[in-house]
A protein has these predicted regions:
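N-terminal, active-site-proximal structural segment of metallo-dependent hydrolase catalytic domains
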Residues: 135-255, 297, 314-323, 335-339, ...
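C-terminal outer-membrane/trafficking sorting elements
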Residues: 8-10, 452-531
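Metal-dependent phosphoester-hydrolase catalytic domains
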Residues: 38-47, 51-55, 62, 119-152, ...
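Beta-strand-turn-beta hairpins that frame and shape the catalytic cleft
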Residues: 158-166, 264-267, 280-306
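Active-site metal-binding loops of divalent metal-dependent hydrolases
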Residues: 171, 212-213, 302-304, 344-346
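Short, positively charged and aromatic/hydrophobic N-terminal segments
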Residues: 3-7, 13
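Sec-dependent N-terminal signal peptides
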Residues: 7-8, 21-31
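Extended non-catalytic accessory segments flanking core domains
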Residues: 35-179, 187-194, 275-280, 315-320, ...
């Protein structure tokens, strides 16, 4: 009996232990898991990377979208907000300038483990990451959204119901001769031409104002021939494109600006006039007449002195020279026109003295600001977004502008996709500057109304997916817009308000959003929406 017992007791104990382990495992599986740490942004004015300090070494999920701020050789940084050059938001020393500096310094995370190629400006929803330090994350998961190459290939930015499309575009040293400024090898030059040509054909503008072209006719002649060989047609009426350019007397190895226009849509009145203050061949002006309506406007395309070639007073001199030329040119008996559109690479940020010459001294309107408040950019420098490629108009022209936007095919791209560093032949990163687009619906009977939009605009929810904006539109006068931002300041949607009762689709992702109604770059109504 004892022998029997001694043989079988260990087996019974082992079986009991197995059963208990199974029951213990079942109990563990039934218990709720430790809640995942979610990082939120309750107050954007005070939020910083310090909130992550307790979670170093742990995994967290960011409830607010994170945005790609830099992408250099597949090395990425992300932040809850886009980093801007401070002078894009305010003059040095102003509250806006200082706030931009604070935001830029509040947080920036390098992030490893991202697969595939992503552009600056792409957003990551529900980013799951390991916190390595207050400046370093490791990717564990998330959903990418927005600003992809596919979206940009699908069409141009929304510019409203325009009849004429005007494009200002710095081509980044478009030369036919091989030299240190442009392409250095024949294969690089061929690839540069293909990339530029794809961009110009995709934009398909009625008038191009081109910057950084080789002096003389060789470069522009090749470019225009390729455009016409593409057999493009004008959107809407499908009129065949017939691009022309001007044979100027500029010779040499340096750069110039140039007009390229569709002779089936517009006619130049005479030939371009220019001012050579500070630098030659880089400030031209011409009046165009729309063939369909007979309406006219003056187009000024420019390339001001670079920031590293003298103080801001030199670019201020250039701005004054442009206005002096305009005030003389518009009095010409064959012109008699006040509608002015100034575009080009002015090599200065929005809140600097050269721009103040136009906006403050001559009461012109900064279209980046009018249409996009403080979210506009066309260029990246020092890992910060900004715009030095401007679109500024006279008040007499403003009501005839249906829309304006930079087309972000270049500034958000990794530098590794340039024509001289890759075999990529797409339009992306064909230049270091984004083309800037302006839609025109010329009508000289329209009158600019500088009065602010009345504060009776109302924002309220429709159904679960809709937002209604009431009394923010005035027919025949002021133009107003709405913009939807996340609480972290990421722009989700923005369009013109075109009716007295205007319906807006809310973003699909759940979260907290701030909706603005604004006019003349100033918000007049704001509402927080929880989705």
């Amino acid at each position: 009996m004892c022998k029997y017992f001694c043989i079988f007791v260990p087996d019974l104990i082992l079986q009991a232990m197995k059963n208990r382990f199974f029951l213990f495992a079942m109990l563990l599986s039934a218990l709720p898991l430790v809640a995942q740490v979610h990082i939120t942004m309750d107050d954007p004015d005070t939020w910083s990377a310090e909130v992550l300090r307790p979670y170093i070494g742990q995994t967290v999920i960011f409830d607010m979208p994170m945005i790609v701020c830099t992408n250099v050789n597949s090395n990425y940084t992300v932040s809850p907000w886009r980093r801007f050059q401070p002078e894009s938001h305010g003059f040095k020393g102003s509250a806006e300038y200082n706030e931009t500096v604070r935001i830029n310094n509040s947080c920036m995370f390098s992030i490893s483990g991202i697969s595939g190629y992503h552009r600056c400006g792409e957003k990551i929803y529900n980013l799951k990451a390991k916190v390595n330090s207050l400046t370093s994350l490791t990717w564990l998961g998330g959903t990418w959204h927005g600003n992809t190459r596919a979206e940009l290939n699908a069409g141009l930015p929304d510019l409203g119901d325009y009849r004429l499309l005007v494009c200002g575009f710095n081509l980044e040293n478009y030369y036919m001769t091989l030299n240190s400024m442009g392409a250095k090898t024949a294969s690089d030059r061929t690839r540069q031409q293909k990339k530029i040509q794809q961009a110009l054909e995709h934009i398909n503008a009625d008038i191009f104002g081109l910057v950084e072209l080789q002096q003389g006719d060789t470069a522009v002649k090749v470019l225009v021939k390729k455009l016409n060989d593409a057999q493009l047609v004008a959107p809407g009426d499908n009129t065949p494109r017939n691009y022309k350019y001007f044979h100027d007397a500029a010779v040499g190895t340096y750069q110039k600006v140039e007009f390229v226009y569709d002779a089936n849509k517009v006619a130049p009145i005479g030939t371009p006039v220019e001012t050579n203050v500070e630098v030659q061949n880089r400030k031209k002006m011409l009046c165009f007449r729309e063939l369909a309506t007979g309406e006219k406007f003056i187009y000024s395309i420019n390339h001001f002195k670079a920031m590293n070639t003298g103080g801001a007073e030199r670019r201020e001199n250039e701005a004054k020279a442009v206005m002096k030329l305009y005030n003389s040119y518009r009095q010409n008996h064959s012109i008699r026109e006040s509608d002015l559109l100034v575009m080009g690479d002015l090599n200065c940020y929005a809140y600097t003295e050269p721009i103040a010459v136009f906006v403050e001294d001559n009461d012109m309107l900064n279209l980046h600001y009018e249409f996009h408040a403080d979210s506009s950019y066309s260029y990246m420098y020092g890992n910060m977004a900004s715009y030095i490629d401007h679109a500024i108009c006279s008040t007499t022209l403003f009501e005839q502008i249906t829309g304006m936007s930079a087309y972000h095919i270049n500034s958000d791209e990794d530098d590794q996709y340039t024509y001289d560093k890759s075999t990529d032949e797409t339009m992306f990163r064909c230049s270091d500057h984004d083309p800037v687009l302006v839609g025109l619906k010329l009508d000289s009977t329209l009158v600019y109304d500088p009065a602010p939009i009345i504060n009776t605009a109302d924002i309220f929810r429709g159904d679960a997916d809709k937002l209604l904006i009431k009394n923010a539109h005035k027919s025949g006068g002021q133009r107003s817009f709405y913009a939807i931002y996340t609480v972290s300041g990421l722009l989700q949607d923005k369009k013109e308000i075109t009716s007295a009762l205007f319906e807006v689709d809310l973003p699909q992702a759940p979260g907290v959003y701030i909706v603005y109604v604004y006019h003349d770059g100033v918000a007049y109504q704001r509402r927080i929406i929880v989705r």
